[in-house]
Amino acid sequence: MAEPGFLSLTLIGALVFGYFLGSIPFGLILTRLAGLGDVRSIGSGNIGATNVLRTGNKKLAAATLIFDMLKGTVAVLVASRYGPDAAIGAGFGAFIGHLFPVWIGFKGGKGVATYLGVLIGLAWPGALVFAAVWIVTALLTRYSSLAALIASIVVPIALYSRGYPAIAVLFAIMTVIVIFKHKANITRLLNGTESKIGAKG
């Protein structure tokens, strides 16, 4: 049986590892490499895939989405070698790293793609629920933010009902953070001024 001190060090190490992996700003890196400048200067100013899509480059937006998801999935899978607690810690660290990346002044994305990536690594059935809810909501409304909010609210409930109580608690916490990070989007949704999927500028 592992000593409590070892468990604490492992969890701290997993959190730190996850944070630095999650803090890689792929949206910013990819748009600059493509010669599109600073993605933070357009649309919502966010470094995530939805804002990258506003450059008009769908392939770049897809690449951003995949890499931001992989940050969460890879963090979980690597840390899982040291136990489920380490996997959860690394996943949460990656999520926080994406939101508050040290490399760009702690001003990152809104965490949705990395949230999904962590979900894939910890409980992939929950990722199917997220994807289904997101797709249906996005098709009906054309609002990426609304789709993400509804999907992230459904996920913890689905996880708990499917027998993942510890992971459900983690995602309940992450969902609260996602909602907080979308407060400006929520205001725009209520005012009818939120940008729809595919809109430029």
From Swiss-Prot:
Subcellular location per UniProt equals:
Cell inner membrane
Lineage, top-rank taxon, reads Bacteria
- In what pathway does it function? Lipid metabolism; phospholipid metabolism
User: Which key words are in the record?
Assistant: Cell inner membrane, Cell membrane, Lipid biosynthesis, Lipid metabolism, Membrane, Phospholipid biosynthesis, Phospholipid metabolism, Transferase, Transmembrane, Transmembrane helix
**Membrane topology (UniProt):** Multi-pass membrane protein
- GO MF annotations in UniProt: acyl-phosphate glycerol-3-phosphate acyltransferase activity
Q: Name one GO biological process term.
A: phospholipid biosynthetic process
Q: Which reaction does it catalyse?
A: an acyl phosphate + sn-glycerol 3-phosphate = a 1-acyl-sn-glycero-3-phosphate + phosphate
Q: What Gene Ontology cellular component terms go with this record? A: plasma membrane
Q: What are the TM regions of this chain, as residue ranges?
A: 9-29, 60-80, 86-106, 116-136, 153-173
EC number(s) on record?
A: 2.3.1.275
The EC class name is: transferase
Q: Which SMART domains match?
A: G3P_acyltransf
Sum up the protein's function in the record's words: Catalyzes the transfer of an acyl group from acyl-phosphate (acyl-PO(4)) to glycerol-3-phosphate (G3P) to form lysophosphatidic acid (LPA). This enzyme utilizes acyl-phosphate as fatty acyl donor, but not acyl-CoA or acyl-ACP.
Q: Name the protein family.
A: Belongs to the PlsY family.
> Quaternary arrangement and interactors, per the entry?
Probably interacts with PlsX.
> What protein does this entry describe?
Glycerol-3-phosphate acyltransferase
Q: Which lineage ranks, top first, belong to the organism behind this chain?
A: Bacteria, Pseudomonadati, Pseudomonadota, Alphaproteobacteria, Hyphomicrobiales
